[in-house]
Amino acid sequence: MSSTENPDSVAAAEELHALRVEAQVLRRQLAQSPEQVRELESKVDSLSIRNSKLMDTLKEARQQLIALREEVDRLGQPPSGYGVLLSVHEDKTVDVFTSGRKMRLTCSPNIDTDTLALGQTVRLNEALTIVEAGTYEQVGEISTLREVLDDGLRALVVGHADEERIVWLAAPLAAVFADPEADIIAYDADSPTRKLRPGDSLLVDTKAGYAFERIPKAEVEDLVLEEVPDVHYDDIGGLGRQIEQIRDAVELPFLHKDLFHEYSLRPPKGVLLYGPPGCGKTLIAKAVANSLAKKIAEARGQDSKDAKSYFLNIKGPELLNKFVGETERHIRMIFQRAREKASEGTPVIVFFDEMDSIFRTRGSGVSSDVETTVVPQLLSEIDGVEGLENVIVIGASNREDMIDPAILRPGRLDVKIKIERPDAESAQDIFSKYLVDGLPINADDLAEFGGDRTACLKAMIVRVVDRMYAESEENRFLEVTYANGDKEVLFFKDFNSGAMIQNIVDRAKKYAIKSVLDTGAPGLRVQHLFDSIVDEFAENEDLPNTTNPDDWARISGKKGERIVYIRTLVTGKNASASRAIDTESNTGQYL
């Protein structure tokens, strides 16, 4: 420092320098402040996110802790018991059957005793207090209902080894007796319950003494079809006389009861339709049920669309059961159901198909004597103490000679109608049911009749029937030898049936379809029908039973002198002569 410089100025200069340095530092710090602020803000955001995650983790841990505590409490609870509710008292106490004892218990405050139903399952805590109401038992023993007692709350049932006991009816079963006049009472809106009837199978808890549910019996339900068949008399061809006979026997008594009463005429109890297979026996029975329902609906002033009748179609062979008494029980249940339906004033037809398989002549069985008890059961149902008002029995068989004579006597199956094989006129009528105007016809065949479809179809039917019923060499079928030595040649027309005619038409339609695919020429031709006849006859060449020719002939509808020998005579085929075997009696079951 020079001597000339003022000390004050020097100090001021140093201070100014220091201020400049400080200002520079402040400028640098000011420039760095926004970055620090941003860093701090990002740190704050990161810490907030971590804090939220920690809070969520803490909540989840707290919830898991609560759930584990509840699980520990649940596992530590004493076991609950179950019982069947027997009765509810005015003081809110209830009687419960539990652990083999009948006990009077109290209910938890959250249980409304007014909603409890008899027979319901309830849950009990360790103090034997009802804490929860359940459903109904779904397992137990099967018992057969004998009868419902007058109070409608109890029933007599038969259990294992024919042990009888009185049981209470659970609420779903007891509810159907609230209105004695009603046949259907909806205990639950989603599942209407029908009235119980003797023979029903019930699910029973024998210890608690309650019946909970009606169990359908598949072995009986499968045997019976309750329906109105959609078959009309117009659908049946060639059986006009037989249809008139069965209408007189079945429809007149139902439609004109006053006239029958005035003339003291008892309506027939049953009808037997017999004849060769495939000739329309079952079809007639179905048409009777349909026609009867419509006629009665018209007589009552109802719409024919609302016509109602019951056609109980009994599958004969399936009715048989290897256990003693089961077949008879099924027959009793079938007629019990028929009486129930008929009590409403609705006609009921009980149709036994293949009647000879069930009600065979007593004493004719070789390996079984089941017919000795089954036949009397049917007889007692038809003309026993309990009447069959509005019920008629129709039987069908192609071996009427094997049915027990007691069933066929007047007063049981009064009317016997033979369904014969169709003659030429009947065959034309049957063909007309299948060859209808709506079928496509080949243009060449139509051209022969000037495009008249009706005339063309009629001519086709006439030509086909003439071909089938001609006693020509190509139509020879069998040569039969009788026991007295006489011989007779039988033609295919002697074994024709409605089922065979339907099969011929179906074959012809198939040929017409194949013709369209092969040649592109649409329409049915008479040649298709001729080819179908040849094929149908050829298929039947080996069908005759030459081991027991007489039994086969009886089933086929050929009765008379006993046949001991059969030889096929089909043209163009190698007919093999069968050796003659004398037929033994009662061999029908081996056919």
Swiss-Prot record:
Task: Give the span(s) annotated as Docks into pockets in the proteasome alpha-ring.
Answer: 590-591
GO MF annotations for this entry?
Answer: ATP binding; ATP hydrolysis activity; CTPase activity
**Presence of keyword Lipid biosynthesis:** no
Which biological processes are named by the entry's GO terms? modification-dependent protein catabolic process; proteasomal protein catabolic process
Q: What is this protein called?
A: Proteasome-associated ATPase
Name the keywords, alphabetized: ATP-binding, Chaperone, Coiled coil, Nucleotide-binding, Proteasome
Question: What is the documented function of this protein?
Answer: ATPase which is responsible for recognizing, binding, unfolding and translocation of pupylated proteins into the bacterial 20S proteasome core particle. May be essential for opening the gate of the 20S proteasome via an interaction with its C-terminus, thereby allowing substrate entry and access to the site of proteolysis. Thus, the C-termini of the proteasomal ATPase may function like a 'key in a lock' to induce gate opening and therefore regulate proteolysis.
What is expression of this protein induced or repressed by?
Constitutively expressed.
PROSITE patterns membership:
AAA (PS00674)
Coiled-coil stretches: 10-77
Species source reads Rhodococcus erythropolis (Arthrobacter picolinophilus)
Domains as described in the record: Consists of three main regions, an N-terminal coiled-coil domain (residues 1-77) that probably binds to protein Pup and functions as a docking station, an interdomain (residues 78-227) involved in Mpa hexamerization, and a C-terminal ATPase domain of the AAA type (residues 228-533).
pH profile: Optimum pH is 7-8.
Which Gene3D superfamilies did the record assign? 1.10.8.60, 1.20.5.170, Nucleic acid-binding proteins, P-loop containing nucleotide triphosphate hydrolases
Q: How is the enzymatic or functional activity of this protein modulated?
A: ATPase activity is inhibited by N-ethylmaleimide (NEM) but not by sodium azide.
The record's section on HAMAP family has: ARC_ATPase
Give an example GO cellular component term for this record. Answer: proteasome complex
- What does the record note on quaternary structure? Homohexamer. Assembles into a hexameric ring structure that likely caps the 20S proteasome core. Can form a complex composed of two stacked hexameric rings in vitro. Probably interacts with the prokaryotic ubiquitin-like protein Pup through a hydrophobic interface; the expected interacting region of ARC lies in its N-terminal coiled-coil domain. There is likely one Pup binding site per ARC hexamer ring. Upon ATP-binding, the C-terminus of ARC probably interacts with the alpha-rings of the proteasome core, possibly by binding to the intersubunit pockets.
Q: Which Pfam families match?
A: AAA, Prot_ATP_ID_OB_C, Prot_ATP_ID_OB_N
